[in-house]
């Protein structure tokens, strides 16, 4: 797999949900006295070229960052960026997750594994959870993203197609071109299709045709691509003395994201984790970004709204219409996905 990465490095960008400031705030909502992002240690497994970790190191100079990546070519790119920026608080190193020694790398307040867990074999997944258990500080948090059942089965049909279409093709560029041709053929074949499942596939094809080549290759043509039920992930984490805290998309924990009939149907499920599992089935969810902590850490599952008064908030908003911001009338703003937010004090 590393040769494939070396041939076409994975495009890495900052993932805001993995930022220690975001993780720290989420932990506080559930009663965890998380370490200040201004002075913490962060480990990223599968850090690629450092596109996620380097901006954190730049903005949090008193914190320490360590990235571990299997591909020497990607680490070399990242190290050159670190050198150019003269960042003393980040270290990117070539390493195999299976060979990482928890005693050597030490403990971390925040551990990140984005786009790794579903794309490695079982032994590596076990080692990720083992390292998380052994390397987390007592109040530390880990972020792990993974493909999710049942929703991933729909996307998996496209993976089946692309693996079939490229089965006799070698080289990253040739595989990519062949995959694009296959997607375009299927897109043409589905014109005028009426089934909801076909509409879903059409939407995914449109996304993949516009995506960065590295995403298509590493997401859909990688040797490993596994999806799990939420309950399966919880069981695996539990075996390693880890427990689930929440999702980085906090709103997905609440049934207000469901239709009224769905809320009614699930209303008698008292266990919050079983309720989340059922929400996955109802929504056909395909991806999760889960936050874990040590199993011996007490959590406050009932979020107290007063906790929110201790935080500052920021959002990517745009003004709806041409409101006058010089008065105290509520003003409507739009989020990036066009949801409305009413603000009483817009300035």
Residue ranges and their predicted role:
Residues 102-111:
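A short acidic, Gly/Pro-enriched loop at the edge of an enzyme's catalytic core
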Residues 49-62:
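Conserved SAM-binding loop of SAM-dependent methyltransferases across substrates and taxa
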Residues 144-171, 175-178, 182-193:
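Conserved class I S-adenosyl-L-methionine
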Residues 126-138:
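A short glycine-rich, Lys/Arg-flanked "PGG" loop and its adjoining helix->strand segment in the class I
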Residues 86-97:
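Conserved SAM-binding strand-loop segment of SAM-dependent methyltransferases
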Residues 7, 11, 15-40, 55:
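Conserved alpha-helix/loop element of class I SAM-dependent methyltransferases that forms part
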Residues 194-347:
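Rossmann-like AdoMet/SAM-dependent catalytic core
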Residues 71:
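Conserved SAM/SAH-binding beta-strand->alpha-helix loop
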